[in-house]
Amino acid sequence: MFNKFNTKPLWEVSKTLSSVAQGFEPADMVIINSRLINVCTREVIENTDVAISCGRIALVGDAKHCIGESTEVIDAKGQYIAPGFLDGHIHVESSMLSVSEYARSVVPHGTVGIYMDPHEICNVLGLNGVRYMIEDGKGTPLKNMVTTPSCVPAVPGFEDTGAAVGPEDVRETMKWDEIVGLGEMMNFPGILYSTDHAHGVVGETLKASKTVTGHYSLPETGKGLNGYIASGVRCCHESTRAEDALAKMRLGMYAMFREGSAWHDLKEVSKAITENKVDSRFAVLISDDTHPHTLLKDGHLDHIIKRAIEEGIEPLTAIQMVTINCAQCFQMDHELGSITPGKCADIVLIEDLKDVKITKVIIDGNLVAKDGVLTTSIAKYDYPEDAMHSMHIKDKITPASFNIMAQNKEKVTTRVIEIIPERVGTYERHIELNVKDDKVQCDPSKDVLKAVVFERHHETGKAGYGFVKGFGIKRGAMAATVAHDAHNLLVIGTNDEDMALAANTLIECGGGMVAVQDGKVLGLVPLPIAGLMSNKPLEEMAEMVEKLDSAWKEIGCDIVSPFMTMALIPLACLPELRLTNRGLVDCNKFEFVSLFIEE
């Protein structure tokens, strides 16, 4: 729970807070004439004051006696006040922004703290990458609570990453002050099949009395889900059906309702609350992955609260889901999540609950944003050289690098990955493709494109070959180093020449995302920090991503956030079929499968 303010622990300031509450000492700040959203009792308390001292709340109620000559008084003028919003599961890397720029982007929207899982940068740079992001966040007002990446690689043995994290590494990071728990345990097969590695990293977290966050994407909610939760996992953001979320809540697991740039699960999973008469204390709203144009256009948790209200969740319940519920999930409600005495003075002023319009944001008793604009400074952080040079490809990539051979054949029946727009899953399809000069041809008329994943961390020269369906592209290619979770170089296209151009464009700029057609680069987003992030401002990044979106449309793709859907093609912990730099993976059986179906 670190930021630029370094608020003192409660035990250091308890005497002062008690004195301020009784009027023996003046408060540093007092908010008057507010309508308090009390998340402890789910009610609005009219005409309430809040006295703040030493970055913490001293009193809630009538605070006239707490005002002295030097007290800063903020007149809420009848506006609502709520605890500052907490995002319980977020990959900052998905915003393509540095941590400091991410903070500048979300704090004015009422976000005061995030539970960051930096497993993207960890897959590239190891724990050094985690350290870099922690240091980047220390110069911001945003509270950066960090979880140690649990699955680096995501599924051991199926891909090549830049680093690996084991139980010994987790044990060491649990000593870091900034670490509050374990990042999403995606290797649920390892938990269910009792592997030493999976249970080892969970065990080291439990020994430290910290929170284990989860990732259980199976539709099975019986013995498998029970076994997963029994291992110590406390929450999960992978519910895509209402029954999934409800089953988790009934078993005492915090169900995190996701609404990001590409994954719009809230419409369905909100029914777990709206269609069932259940307590919502085990429900949390999170963003998971949010892109720069979404942050600029829609906002952050303020937008997600609004979406929850639109889906029928009561406004006060929605606010509980980004405040006290989240804090309790991470066993931090003694510090965060409510406007009550002793807690950190993280408060948002809301003009109305329907539109969730944030007018002021206070963090640790400091006014940090007003009317959508940050009012405090943020220190710039320069990422070290190893973070800025992460493209290590062994062989020069040419059109011939994309050949998929099938000798003495005219046609082959091929396993094809079919994407599901706006969903994380894929389908395995079997499609007959033509062979010309012993080379298997993609078939844009059937919406079947060629896909190749090149290892980019250790110059191993390994590459996985396959085909994908569902993007709708008739001509051109796209490439990305944002390719979960190993973040190798993923290239998809209709022809080898454009695919080579796309790959080499990213190698030259240090990583990123690109779309090309007929030998021309139509859209490019350079991401020089680990091939994942940029140090450019939000507005500039949003413009580049918007241009890339337009480039995707120009080459024939109309799905929402196509680069995010593309980025999940190598993620071998999600069903059904995936492609890593080692080959095709059946993610139901967790085994490699051949590209061709033998007759």
Curated annotation (Swiss-Prot):
State the CDD domains in the record. AdeC (cd01295)
Q: Which domain of life is it from?
A: Bacteria
Instruction: Provide the disulphide bond pattern.
Output: none
Gene Ontology biological-process annotations: adenine catabolic process
**GO terms of molecular function:** adenine deaminase activity
Q: Which UniProt keywords apply?
A: Hydrolase, Manganese
EC code: 3.5.4.2
Q: Which Gene3D superfamilies match?
A: Metal-dependent hydrolases, Urease, subunit C, domain 1
Q: What class of enzyme is it?
A: hydrolase
- Required cofactor(s): Mn(2+)
**SUPFAM superfamilies to which the protein is assigned, alphabetical:** Composite domain of metallo-dependent hydrolases (SSF51338), Metallo-dependent hydrolases (SSF51556)
**So what does this thing catalyse?**
adenine + H2O + H(+) = hypoxanthine + NH4(+)
Pfam families from the xrefs?
Adenine_deam_C, Amidohydro_1
Q: Which family does it belong to?
A: Belongs to the metallo-dependent hydrolases superfamily. Adenine deaminase family.
Task: List, alphabetically, the HAMAP family matched.
Answer: Adenine_deamin
Give the protein's recorded name: Adenine deaminase
